[in-house]
Amino acid sequence: PSATSGRININVSPQNTSIIHAIYKTTNGNNISGVYKSTNKGLNWTTLGMNGLESSGFDWYIGVIETAPNNPGVLYVGSIDMFRTTNNGSSWTNLTNAYSGTFDQQHPDQHAFWINPLNSQYIINGNDGGIFISTNAGTNWSKRYDLPITQYYAGCIDFLNPAKKYGGTQDNGSHGSVNPGPAGWEVLYGGDGFHCAVDYTNSNVIYMESQNGGIGRSDDGGNNFDGITGGLDLARTNWSSPYMLDVQTSTTVYFGSYKLHKSTNKGNNWTIISPDLTKGQNGRLGTITCMSNAVLPSTQRVIYTGADDGRVMVTTNSGTNWTDISAGLPVRYVTDVVVDKRNPNVAYVTLSGFNMDERNTHAFRTTNYGTNWVNITGNLLNVPANSLIIDYNKDSTLFVGTDAGVYYT
């Protein structure tokens, strides 16, 4: 292609290494923009047809191309679904139809294929839902191995019954578990799962969330959920939009898009209590990523927020006034902000980022509401720090979750 390209996937035919296929997407779009074939090791390319090859809007994230090992004329492409052509792209057949069946039969977002070189009817498909196998070239699929693994974005527990655990996962919904072990988990809320929270005075009240702020509430212990997004300004939302319960009044909920919202009736109604707490929209940046709250003796709320563009804000009067306290912090994605509930002028921030000019700058502490920040990264590896918690049973103990593991000090 002559246009600026984004993600490119390439396959070299195992039967004839002169034959190469490629799919690409442009930088200004999220769909497959073209399928190409070369028969002379890439010296020249021809465009293949895309009739029936449905794109997903997520091909910057997924997208794979393979040729049948014993027939380079048979081509497979993975997007949300898996497609096959036997006529150089004149027509494509959807082999998975992930949204038309159950996720035990197939799952969206295809990442990897393996086609048996001795029997091309036998295909192994890896996607966001696990491993699926077809023994008839994609006509039917079955989920295999049922590995008890998935990618969790966030988790929470029921403080009245800590055996009850909940979490939100990548493309596999939000889960809940009462019993230990993989058999004890069940899907409670669909979509991509993110933050969750349980009312600390009533175990039946559970909050869960799908992508881009799709928050819902259950009043019956997770059996049924109702959406509570009415009244939220969702013009700019993070993929994993943060929300939290008030530290003292469990029916009060805060939700962050690019503004902070407050509900005093468990999300039935919302009020905006802040201006834009980011630096403004800039591409995909300009959303709140994290928040934390505490109570002053005056009963005023102290709330800290962090954003994907590096801005950190604080209010010490329940949202009436806000102060930008980003000065002294690197300009990076703010992954977590945590206020010390015993002393709200103390707060911690963790930051993302790789190989920056300022090395070892992933964790900071303030003791004066963000007027000054102290770098407490110490001997943490120079990788993103994603979360931080305070051990309130031990005055000086902190835990930090990073891309390289969990650390404590």
What are the residue ranges of the model-derived segments?
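Beta-propeller blade termini and top-face loops
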Residues: 1-409
